[in-house]
């Protein structure tokens, strides 16, 4: 039995000391071809230091092992050494194309996608391997060169590439067309991809595209397919619920939103949607509960505060509106509702202060001015009221009641 075989047997027995003993003997005594097989095996099971030691010994005889040395160096984070190994492979070598591809991989890992693309272009001068064309199209897609990417993918046999990579070129072409705003072409290729092989992401992209094109019935069809086949797919419930809502299936839309919240109870946009749907279904308590839940984790409170204030105003819950002031809202409508709530609760001085702060922003809004004028009358600030009425009448000159009020003041 060769030293290499003895080493492998020791590894099977998990006797690392014995394995190392035979490894050292193999380096000295075993023939090169047997050592090469041992190196391939050791690399495959993650024994990189030992594999690297063999490859370095054999590199003068088998220069192609510089590819393996480069891969191991890269795994160890030694990128400069990895490139140095690849430089040992010359253009007249059968391994040169593989070296260029590996260089492209390393450059892409380093974020130098443009340089990676140059290496694949160079490789195509030596080989017309479809996987090179595919790799170039992938890089073009990553770089945003969608037209170039489409040209590349279009050269390839979809089934052949799918069998080798698990990626559909039809799906890639459809996605690229979508980014270019060519939605009809995008849908055509995505549907073709889905016909040949079901894919969660493709179904989601189709559903989303149809929704964006306001073809809600078709969007619902693909979202439902996703919901049936792949209910664990991340994040489809929001779009599905929206599409159902557009189709006037509000109860079902709420159920789907709630289904999404079971997976992710803190997703703000789902909570806001569930609140809206609950309110439309005349479930104000549930609508409020969803908003309050969203408020706990939302980074941006403004929309939530506006919705809460609007709901409270419709229910004449003015004290609850005033309680929102502690969050220091920036939205003008929310601030306006707070000002009005001070007025409704007869805290007129606080109302006056709030209205005054809003005048610069809302002075062109007739409804705001009308409320402000009535407040000024209540406070006995008649000159200020007359001044605001004059401005109001410039905006609404045919308001007879306001003209009469001005004359009375």
Description of each model-found segment:
Residues 37, 68-71, 102, 135, ...:
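Canonical tetratricopeptide repeat
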Residues 1, 33-36, 64-67, 97-98, ...:
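Start-of-helix register in tetratricopeptide repeats
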Residues 29-31, 60-63, 94, 127-128, ...:
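Short coil turns that delineate tetratricopeptide repeat
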Residues 25-26, 55-58, 88-89, 122-123, ...:
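Canonical positions in the second alpha-helix
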Residues 2-25, 29, 33, 37-50, ...:
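Alpha-helical segment of the N-proximal tetratricopeptide repeat
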């Amino acid at each position: 039995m060769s030293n290499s075989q003895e080493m492998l047997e020791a590894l099977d027995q998990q006797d690392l000391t014995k394995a190392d003993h035979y490894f050292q003997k193999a380096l000295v005594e075993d023939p090169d071809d047997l050592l090469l097989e041992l190196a391939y095996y050791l690399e495959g099971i993650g024994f990189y230091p030992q594999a690297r030691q063999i490859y370095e010994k054999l590199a003068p005889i088998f220069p192609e092992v510089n590819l393996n040395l480069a891969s191991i160096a890269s795994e160890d984070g030694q990128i400069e050494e990895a490139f140095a190994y690849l430089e040992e492979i010359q253009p007249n070598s059968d391994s040169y194309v593989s070296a260029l591809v590996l260089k492209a991989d390393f450059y892409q890992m380093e974020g130098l996608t443009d340089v990676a693309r140059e290496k694949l272009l160079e490789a195509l001068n030596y080989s017309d391997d479809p996987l090179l064309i595919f790799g170039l199209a992938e890089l073009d897609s990553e770089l945003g060169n969608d037209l170039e990417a489409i040209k590349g993918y279009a050269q390839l046999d979809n089934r052949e590439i799918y069998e080798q990579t698990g990626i559909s070129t039809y799906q890639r072409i459809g996605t690229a067309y979508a980014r270019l705003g060519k939605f009809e072409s995008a849908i055509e290729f995505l549907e073709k991809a889905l016909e040949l092989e079901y894919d969660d992401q493709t179904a989601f992209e189709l559903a989303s595209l149809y929704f964006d094109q306001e073809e809600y019935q078709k969007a619902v069809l693909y979202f439902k397919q996703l919901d049936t086949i792949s209910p664990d797919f991340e994040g489809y419930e929001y779009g599905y619920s929206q599409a159902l809502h557009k189709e006037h299936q509000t109860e079902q839309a709420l159920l789907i939103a709630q289904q999404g919240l079971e997976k992710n109870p803190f997703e703000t946009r789902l909570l806001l949607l569930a609140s809206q749907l609950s309110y439309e279904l005349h479930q104000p308590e549930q609508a409020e509960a969803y908003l309050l839940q969203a408020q706990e984790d939302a980074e941006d409170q403004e929309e939530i505060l506006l919705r809460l204030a609007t709901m409270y105003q419709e229910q004449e819950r003015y004290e609850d509106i005033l309680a929102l002031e502690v969050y220091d809202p920036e939205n003008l409508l929310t601030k306006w509702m707070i000002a009005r709530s001070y007025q409704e609760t007869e805290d007129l001085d606080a109302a006056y202060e709030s209205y005054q702060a809003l005048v610069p922003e809302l002075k062109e809004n007739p409804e705001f001015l009308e409320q402000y004028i009535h407040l000024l009358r209540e406070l006995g600030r008649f000159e200020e009221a007359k001044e605001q009425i004059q401005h109001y009448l410039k905006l609404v000159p045919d308001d007879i009641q306001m003209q009469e009020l001005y004359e009375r003041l």
